[in-house]
Amino acid sequence: MHSPPALGKVNMSQLQDNFGRRFHYLRLSITDACNFKCTYCLPDGYQSQGNSPFLSLSEIELLLGAFSQMGTQKVRITGGEPSLRKDFIDIIGLAANTPNIKTVATTTNGYRLAKNAQAWYDAGLRRINVSIDSLDPKMFYQITGENRFDQVMRGVDAALESGFERVKINAVLLKGLNSQDLPRFLHWIKHMPVDLRFIELMETGLGREYFKAHHLAGTQVKQQLIRDGWQLDKADILDGPAQNFSHSDYQGRIGLIMPYEKNFCVSCNRLRVSAKGQLHLCLFTENGVNLKDLLQDKSQTPELMARLQQQLGFKTAAHSLHQGITGVTTHLASIGG
């Protein structure tokens, strides 16, 4: 059992675990709610879990202040669907104005993007990931349960026009559903300056049968890209475990997130906080650690920072997905993926 470091004596300059990994990147979920019904995430739609409220604006401010003092440079605002929060734009502004935070990003299903891209950018958002699992409108509907393909694509155009530093498209690899879409995606990014991210399907507590039916190894896509002349790019400190590829004939780039590949966790650089204030050292840990009790007053910040540093002592070297251990993650919307 690790003893908590003494307040006032712990080195608060950098979040670092026992394996030498430094954590520059916070993924902050602000809601579990989502208006899409993606088959790999919320096939039955969003169902509220209990009465515990989501983090308030003041709690988020204190949380970001503590993380930023401990080396966090990038914050990604996630959900659920983060734009469902009425104060979403205020949260963007809060993150953007937090000292030491260099990059504010979000991941969205894109249904509000066309109308709000410029306002979000003006508030301080600089990077955006849009979930588009298929470029076939019929398959898009089959996967998401929403007939909003054209609306989401207009949102991507609006994001590019608004001046975002980077626009990424997230597509979960699904055998038998979108697994034949690679040529269509490649054709699209030939003249589109976006980063296309193929994400290998991960097993969750409520999705074991779905995983067995639709899991497609990302290594298959990687091998095809290499055969087609795509080159592996040098990793950036904030990239984490993603493998990024570029090709001289394409404006867009491709990223692969392959959690089942050997050494995936070696370059882990992120921590997660759920919408209800639980710290998760890994997407697939057994338990979250409550932080909300230390987000009530600024005077609690030293104790909050000490708790964060203490908990990193419990972070394991790697997840246990290969053993079918998915931890507390019943579905990806619960923590933000």
UniProtKB/Swiss-Prot annotation:
Residues 18-242 form the Radical SAM core domain. InterPro entries: Aldolase_TIM, Elp3/MiaA/NifB-like_rSAM, MoaA, MoaA_twitch, MoCo_biosynth_MoaA/MoaC, rSAM. It catalyses: GTP + AH2 + S-adenosyl-L-methionine = (8S)-3',8-cyclo-7,8-dihydroguanosine 5'-triphosphate + 5'-deoxyadenosine + L-methionine + A + H(+). It is an enzyme of class 4 (lyase). S-adenosyl-L-methionine binds at Y40, G80, S131, M202. Signal peptide: none annotated. PROSITE patterns: RADICAL_SAM. [4Fe-4S] cluster 2 binds at C265, C268, C282. GTP binds at R27, R76, T107, K168, R270, L271, R272. The keyword Methyltransferase does not apply. One of its GO terms (molecular function) is GTP 3',8'-cyclase activity. Pathway: Cofactor biosynthesis; molybdopterin biosynthesis. Binds 2 [4Fe-4S] clusters. Binds 1 [4Fe-4S] cluster coordinated with 3 cysteines and an exchangeable S-adenosyl-L-methionine and 1 [4Fe-4S] cluster coordinated with 3 cysteines and the GTP-derived substrate. Its cofactor is [4Fe-4S] cluster. [4Fe-4S] cluster 1 binds at C34, C38, C41. Disulfide bonds: none annotated. Keywords: 4Fe-4S, GTP-binding, Iron, Iron-sulfur, Lyase, Metal-binding, Molybdenum cofactor biosynthesis, Nucleotide-binding, S-adenosyl-L-methionine. Its EC number is 4.1.99.22. GO terms for biological process: Mo-molybdopterin cofactor biosynthetic process. Catalyzes the cyclization of GTP to (8S)-3',8-cyclo-7,8-dihydroguanosine 5'-triphosphate. Monomer and homodimer. Belongs to the radical SAM superfamily. MoaA family. This is GTP 3',8-cyclase. It comes from Shewanella denitrificans (strain OS217 / ATCC BAA-1090 / DSM 15013).
